[in-house]
């Protein structure tokens, strides 16, 4: 009996169950029609009986029986003409249970034997064109590819050829050959830097901070004052000793030459462009031999103080500065003569291509004068570290490069001065805090105790790093784990000794 006969209402669960079991069977109705027409009528009837069995409701005899029982019921109710057929009687028994478990018969079909003939492609395309089928339907990749016959006929070699297409790369490179991001960024950076430099000179320079009356002056006068201030700042920074160098005042007729023609930004790149009005201009035919005659001979100076004063005034690291007049006041103990001025000046003519000016540099001392000055300027260093003991150490200096710090504490064992020398104060302090401490910790080596007994127990180490060096040097045959055990024993059995 069916649900219609019983008059019962079907629930949503029943509807979903029917759809799940009968979905594939409905889709394969067209394929079933293409089967061999010589199929036995008994097998066809069994399939129809299985399809109709899931549409019945609340019939325990139908839902609980197995496939074999269902086959027996079908055979008993078959028409007489089918039973009389000798071919049907000799046919093998149908595998009803196996047919029920085969939900998707297309899984057993290989991809090579499957073609577009199993599916009505024209009907599916018609549904897609009319919008009756959703494009995002639950199609398998195999089913979706079988719809497009052209895609199924493609070979894998064609896809590899598309990936390795050199013509496409050449077309792309030719199309975007002029697209150079790095060059554009560099041009933008240069333009921005130039604009920033111009704004800095025009707005933030000290020229704009002058009074209103000074704004009426010419550009040359304002640049002259601006560079004059810069030169005075350089003099104040480059002087090594203000007491030895007199304050230099530039004359009022200080002028600039060809500033705007050589440098439009208004900044001086070469200090040799500054020319004093009262001094003679330096020409290209000036020679170093003629001007070096006026230099004082450093080897003839008998006093080392005079040599040192001259060397202090010379800035040997700055070769691009202009000529700096230097004056030093020297007095003698046995004579009260007026102050004598010693001027050291040296000019060197350097001719540049396309320029008519030369650069002047400062005089450099000889190697002998440098040695005398360096030996005089060095002063002995005295270092007195703070310690808790009264007598700590002495500082001995054998030569200019080696310094030794000697410990003068009394050794509690020998009752004599320790006399240990160290090259660093850190080592001396660590030595005094460990060896000469009133209460210090000691470490023992377990391997020495095991091998030597009491003698090994008397062997102690003031620091743990000393014990580590002892293990590496004396117990080389120990493994890494055994060395760690020795160190662990020393840490857990620390001894203390009072002086």
Swiss-Prot record:
Compositionally biased intervals (Basic and acidic residues): 331-344
Gene (name only): RPN4
Location of the region described as Disordered in the Swiss-Prot/TrEMBL record: 329-397
Keyword Nucleotide-binding: no
Induction data: Expression is up-regulated in a fluconazole-resistant mutant.
Function statement: Transcription factor that acts as a transcriptional activator of a number of genes encoding proteasomal subunits. Plays a role in ergosterol and plasma membrane homeostasis, and subsequent azole resistance. Regulates the expression of 212 genes, activating 80 genes and repressing, likely in an indirect fashion, 132 genes. Targets comprise several proteasome and ergosterol biosynthesis genes, including ERG1, ERG2, ERG3, and ERG11. Directly regulates ERG11 expression through the 3'-TTGCAAA-5' binding motif.
Protein known as: C2H2-type transcription factor RPN4
ZnF (C2H2-type) residues: 405-436
Domain of life: Eukaryota
A GO term, aspect molecular function: zinc ion binding
Keywords, in A-Z order: Activator, DNA-binding, Metal-binding, Nucleus, Transcription, Transcription regulation, Zinc, Zinc-finger
GO biological process, one term: positive regulation of transcription by RNA polymerase II
Biased composition (Polar residues): 345-363
Compartments, record wording: Nucleus
GO CC, one annotated term: nucleus
InterPro entries per UniProt: Znf_C2H2_type (IPR013087)
Disulfide topology: none
Gene3D superfamilies named in the record: Classic Zinc Finger
């Amino acid at each position: 009996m069916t649900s219609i006969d019983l008059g019962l209402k079907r629930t949503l669960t029943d509807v979903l169950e029917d759809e799940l079991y009968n979905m594939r069977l409905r889709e394969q109705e067209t394929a079933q029609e293409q089967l061999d027409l010589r199929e036995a009528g008994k097998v066809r009837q069994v399939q129809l009986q299985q399809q109709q069995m899931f549409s019945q409701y609340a019939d325990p005899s139908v839902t609980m029986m197995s496939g074999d029982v269902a086959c027996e019921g079908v055979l008993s109710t078959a028409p007489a003409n089918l039973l009389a057929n000798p071919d049907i009687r000799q046919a093998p028994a149908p595998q009803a249970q196996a047919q029920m478990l085969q939900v998707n018969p297309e899984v057993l079909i290989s991809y090579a034997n499957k073609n577009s003939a199993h599916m009505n492609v024209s009907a599916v395309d018609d549904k897609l064109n009319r919008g009756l089928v959703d494009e995002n339907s639950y199609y398998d990749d195999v089913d979706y590819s079988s719809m497009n016959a052209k895609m199924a006929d493609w070979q894998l070699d064609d896809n590899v050829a598309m990936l390795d297409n050199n013509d496409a790369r050449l077309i792309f490179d030719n199309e975007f050959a002029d697209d150079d991001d790095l060059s554009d960024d560099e041009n933008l950076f240069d333009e921005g830097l130039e604009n920033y430099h111009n704004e800095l000179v025009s707005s933030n320079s000290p020229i704009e901070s002058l009074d209103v009356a000074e704004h009426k002056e010419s550009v040359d006068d304002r640049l002259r004052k601006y560079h004059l201030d810069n030169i005075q700042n350089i003099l104040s920074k480059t002087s090594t000793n203000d007491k030895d160098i007199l304050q230099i005042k530039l004359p009022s007729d200080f002028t600039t030459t060809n500033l705007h023609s050589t440098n439009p930004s208004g900044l001086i790149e070469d200090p040799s462009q500054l020319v004093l009005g009262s001094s003679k201009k330096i020409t290209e035919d000036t020679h170093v031999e003629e001007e070096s005659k006026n230099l004082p001979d450093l080897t003839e100076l008998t006093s080392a103080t005079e040599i040192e004063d001259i060397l202090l005034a010379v800035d040997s690291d700055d070769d691009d500065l202009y000529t700096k007049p230097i004056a030093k006041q020297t007095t003698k103990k046995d004579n009260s003569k007026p102050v004598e001025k010693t001027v050291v000046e040296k000019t060197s003519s350097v001719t540049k291509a396309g320029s008519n000016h030369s650069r002047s540099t400062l005089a450099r001392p000889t190697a002998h004068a440098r040695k005398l000055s360096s030996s005089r300027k060095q002063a002995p260093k005295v270092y007195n570290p703070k310690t808790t003991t009264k007598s700590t150490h002495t500082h001995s200096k054998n030569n200019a490069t080696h310094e030794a710090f000697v410990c003068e504490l009394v050794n509690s064992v020998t009752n004599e001065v320790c006399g240990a020398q160290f090259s660093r104060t850190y080592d001396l302090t660590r030595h005094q805090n460990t060896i000469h401490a009133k209460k210090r910790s000691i470490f023992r080596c377990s391997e020495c105790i095991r091998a030597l007994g009491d003698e090994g127990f008397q062997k102690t180490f003031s620091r743990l790093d000393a014990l580590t060096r002892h293990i590496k040097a004396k117990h080389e045959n120990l493994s890494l784990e055994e060395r760690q055990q020795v160190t662990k024993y020393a840490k857990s059995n620390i001894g203390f000794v009072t002086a």
